[in-house]
């Protein structure tokens, strides 16, 4: 995989060693999909078991919503398996790793709003399955479909694939540029980021938390994620998603996942203020696994869960300023203004209301 001019990782064939066997084309999900995105709808889930889930422990605070993926992976490790998920590496790049260490689960918690680098994880998952190990893989719909296609005829009985409900994947180049701009602004090296930190105000108003090393001193910067942080807001405004995300062919049941998990964008009394997960069992194997997990798991109506998660079957519309943004961002030297220039008026209105303590109150009234 190599980055294209917009920074997205794309398949790349090394023609110096290519023997023209055609195997890469045969396993490419994009070239071989039979999915018809026109058939995806809320009703794609009517025959699937759906659940509201949350952990009843402090570990839920570290997760983006109810902690379902954390619980699923922890259970796999406890039974001698390995897990594959996304973490921040030492350079604050999003990468997938495969591990049997429980300590790595904390690195996999919470959202990373950038396309992750898969590396050799597909090959490693395949090798573990051939050795009879239990494996959990968690990724975006396209990453999950890619794994399933890569495995081919390999016995995947011991694999549980979990696909996250996906808005789309931002460019690694954009994240790198934003990181550089912020490091220059705060005169330090970014060493930690949590784009969905819940410790201050809970799930309803998550913060984007950055920690910088400024000459040996830690500097923490927190902004309300979808209200006051330009990077997260512009991601949610679909400004710098991959082109294919605007007509994703891996929505609904088009990715082959055993389980689909994500936010429940509403509230239930039992969950308190720390969030709840929407979980869909897409296969009998996925449903059986869900039932083995600890925590609060309540059978729910698929309409209730899917109606607040339209990204289950819909793709985002392309932001009309996308092309202009990528022209700016590819310059050698950029500033924060190259991002804030694209913020719509509603960003500043939301930010002002949040600063006045009125945003959540108004949101409740409108609901």
Question: Where are these predicted regions, by residue range?
Answer:
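Long, compositionally biased charged/polar accessory segments in the mid-to-C-terminal portions
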Residues: 79-82, 188-367
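Ferredoxin-like iron-sulfur electron-transfer modules
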Residues: 1-20, 191, 225-236
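Cysteine-centered iron-sulfur cluster-binding motifs in ferredoxin-type domains/subunits
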Residues: 12-31, 64-67, 142, 241-248
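Short, flexible loop segments at boundaries between secondary-structure elements
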Residues: 158-181
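Low-complexity, highly charged intrinsically disordered N-terminal segments
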Residues: 64, 69-91
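Iron-sulfur cluster-binding cysteine motifs and their immediate structural context
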Residues: 1-12, 23-41, 258-259
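Glycine-rich phosphate-binding "P-loop"
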Residues: 93-123
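A short alpha->loop->secondary-structure connector
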Residues: 104-105, 152-164
């Amino acid at each position: 995989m190599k980055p294209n001019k917009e920074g997205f990782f794309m398949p790349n064939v090394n023609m110096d060693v290519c023997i023209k066997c055609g195997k890469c084309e045969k396993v490419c999900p994009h070239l071989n999909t039979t999915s018809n995105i026109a058939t995806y709808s809320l009703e794609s889930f009517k025959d699937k078991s759906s659940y509201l889930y949350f952990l009843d422990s402090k570990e839920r605070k570290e997760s983006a919503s109810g902690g379902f993926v954390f619980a699923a992976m922890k259970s796999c490790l406890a039974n001698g398996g390995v897990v594959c998920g996304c973490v921040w590496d030492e350079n604050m790049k999003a990468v997938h790793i495969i591990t049997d260490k429980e300590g790595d689960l904390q690195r996999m918690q919470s959202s990373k709003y950038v396309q992750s680098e898969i590396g050799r994880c597909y090959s490693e998952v395949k090798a573990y399955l051939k050795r009879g190990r239990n494996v959990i893989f968690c990724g975006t719909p396209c990453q999950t479909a890619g794994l399933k296609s890569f495995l081919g005829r390999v016995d995947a009985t011991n694999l549980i694939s979990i696909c996250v409900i996906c808005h789309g994947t931002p460019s690694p180049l954009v994240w790198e540029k934003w990181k550089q701009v912020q490091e220059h602004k705060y005169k330090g090296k970014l060493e930690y980021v949590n784009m969905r930190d819940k410790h201050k105000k809970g799930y309803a108003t998550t913060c984007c938390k950055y920690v910088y090393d400024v000459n040996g001193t830690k500097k923490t910067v927190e902004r309300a994620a979808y209200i006051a942080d330009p990077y997260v807001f512009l991601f949610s405004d679909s400004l710098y998603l991959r082109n294919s995300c605007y007509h994703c062919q891996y929505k609904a049941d088009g990715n082959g996942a055993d389980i689909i998990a994500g936010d429940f964008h509403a509230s239930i009394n039992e969950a308190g203020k720390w969030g709840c997960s929407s979980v869909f069992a897409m296969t009998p194997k996925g449903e059986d696994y869900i039932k083995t997990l600890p925590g609060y798991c309540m059978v729910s109506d698929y309409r209730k869960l899917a109606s607040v998660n339209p990204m289950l079957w819909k793709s985002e519309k392309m932001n009309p300023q996308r092309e202009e943004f990528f022209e700016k961002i590819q310059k050698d030297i950029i500033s924060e203004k190259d991002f804030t220039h694209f913020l719509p008026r509603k960003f500043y209105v939301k930010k002002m209301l949040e600063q006045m303590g009125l945003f959540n109150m108004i949101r409740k009234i409108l609901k």
